Amino acid sequence: MYKSLRIALPVALVLLGLFVLIGTGVIGKGRDANFLRQDFAWLWSAGHMMLGGENAYDYDTFRPVLMSVVGQHAGNAYAYPPHLGPIAMHWGALPFEIGAWVLTAENVVFTLLLAGGVFMLVRQATGERWYAATAAGLMLMCPYAAHVTAMGQTSLLVAAALLWGWYFTYRDKPIVGGVLLAIAAIKPMFLVLPVVWLLLNRKWVA
């Protein structure tokens, strides 16, 4: 019976995590309609403008484009660093609704990559598949993952890039690691301490 419970717990956590992620993050159950894909509007507007050769950092030009998809709630400027531009453009090249669903699907993939990374690292640290599977299930159940997916944010992209960038950097694959860490730098505040740590460990090639 104990063995059966050990198998059942991580499986249940993974299935429950996927249920929460898809139900509240993808489908949007229990969330206000105005909340869904809200942050994606900034990303799409910037990418759409960049494809047209316009400056997304000019608020007077940016605001009308943003208002065309979010109405009167457009208050903040586009504040991401320039190297998010190519990523934003692949959303902006699509109609708004289709682009939003593309990012939603990508956020599900990023969540799975995070869960896979957690599984791998915990298994390496403990040597136990059970602990690793349980940790991965808890990662999938994280309410923040569903929240970010529903809003259309980039935090899951940043987290997945940071985790796997760190992994490859410490396995002497600085090019892959460096590219992933550069992607994570679209939110620089999450990269300050990891970069300091890498420098202290003489991993500055990344």
Which positions does each model-derived feature cover?
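Transmembrane helix irregularities
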Residues: 94, 141, 169, 183-187, ...
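Membrane-helix interface segments
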Residues: 96-98, 127-133, 171-176, 203-206
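Transmembrane and membrane-interface helices of multi-pass
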Residues: 125, 130-145
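Start-transfer (signal-anchor) and selected internal transmembrane alpha helices
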Residues: 1-26, 132-134
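TM-lumen/periplasm interface segments of multi-pass membrane proteins
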Residues: 17-124, 128
